[in-house]
């Protein structure tokens, strides 16, 4: 089972996309010599806006936010679940210290610490989205090509993409 995304306008009606049209669209995009797209049952479909949202701060009194309650990123950068796990990795010891030891230090720093990673990953997801999803604006299209060329031809560009894509250290 796999999840695929086809770029369509946000106001697209799902009724306009039959299973055959979806498979044809994917086959066009995956038209590679020596490889054939394996079709199957489409179990779900939706129009997903490529949007970002960050709630700052990620704490209000005794309420701590983590994961999708605190931030939304487009799937292009593959960061949503990673961010949620990183949030919980910070929040769990903070809550243990707060509840068991009455030590507020980690809890008080949770939001600021988590937001450093959240903003970095939100920017990366935005960057990947603008680099990989076409724009009808000629100026934006040239910026996109410039970015793609830089990532494909520059060691620094490739390293930056790889570091952000593979994940930042937990303490970032």
Residue map of PLM features:
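Conserved FAD/dinucleotide-binding core of flavoprotein oxidoreductases
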Residues: 1-46
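FAD-binding beta-loop-beta segment adjacent to the flavin cofactor pocket
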Residues: 48-69
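Glycine-rich phosphate/pyrophosphate-binding beta-alpha loops
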Residues: 52-54, 70-82, 116
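Short, conserved glycine- and acidic-residue-centered signature motifs
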Residues: 59, 81-84
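Extended, hydrophobic alpha-helical segments in both membrane/secreted and soluble proteins
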Residues: 65-74, 85-95
């Amino acid at each position: 089972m796999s999840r695929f995304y086809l770029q369509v306008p946000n106001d697209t009606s799902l009724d306009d996309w039959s299973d055959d049209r979806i498979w044809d669209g994917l086959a066009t995009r995956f038209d590679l010599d020596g490889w054939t797209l394996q079709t199957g049952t489409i179990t779900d479909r939706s129009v997903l806006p490529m949007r970002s949202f960050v709630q700052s701060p990620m704490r209000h009194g005794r309420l701590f936010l983590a994961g999708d309650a605190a931030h939304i990123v487009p799937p292009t950068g593959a960061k949503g679940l990673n961010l949620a796990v990183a949030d919980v990795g910070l929040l769990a010891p903070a809550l243990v210290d707060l509840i068991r030891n009455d030590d507020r230090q980690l809890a008080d720093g949770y939001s600021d610490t988590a937001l450093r990673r959240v903003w970095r990953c939100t920017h990366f997801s935005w960057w990947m989205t603008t680099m990989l999803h076409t724009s009808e604006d000629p100026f934006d299209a040239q910026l996109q090509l410039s970015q793609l060329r830089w990532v494909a031809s520059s060691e620094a560009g490739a390293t930056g993409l790889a570091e952000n894509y593979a994940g930042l250290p937990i303490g970032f």
